[in-house]
From Swiss-Prot:
This is UPF0235 protein Npun_R3528. The lineage of its organism: Bacteria, Bacillati, Cyanobacteriota, Cyanophyceae, Nostocales. Transmembrane segments: none annotated. It comes from Nostoc punctiforme (strain ATCC 29133 / PCC 73102). Belongs to the UPF0235 family. PANTHER family: UPF0235 PROTEIN C15ORF40. InterPro entries: DUF167, YggU-like_sf. Residues 1-23 are annotated as: Disordered.
Length: 75
């Protein structure tokens, strides 16, 4: 499964909002420095979708706020 994700680093709280188009807006506490925000993003998405962190990959947008995430789910 692939999801478009818009990341908002340096937020006061962590939360995930689903948008009407199926994309996600993810608010992260971490700054976008040294991959900290990406690590926090993967951790939050793994918890939301109940998968291991290793099952989530950033396909594109590694250094951007607009990302394409791939989630491997055994269904």
């Amino acid at each position: 499964m692939q999801k478009k994700v818009k990341v908002k680093p340096n937020s006061k709280q962590q939360k995930i909002e689903e948008q009407p188009d199926g994309s996600l807006t993810v608010y992260l506490k971490s700054p976008p420095v040294d991959g900290k925000a990406n690590e926090e993003l993967i951790k939050l998405l793994a918890k939301k979708f109940d998968v291991a962190k290793s099952d989530i990959r950033i396909k594109s947008g590694l250094s951007s706020r607009q990302k394409l995430i791939e989630i491997d789910r055994d269904v």
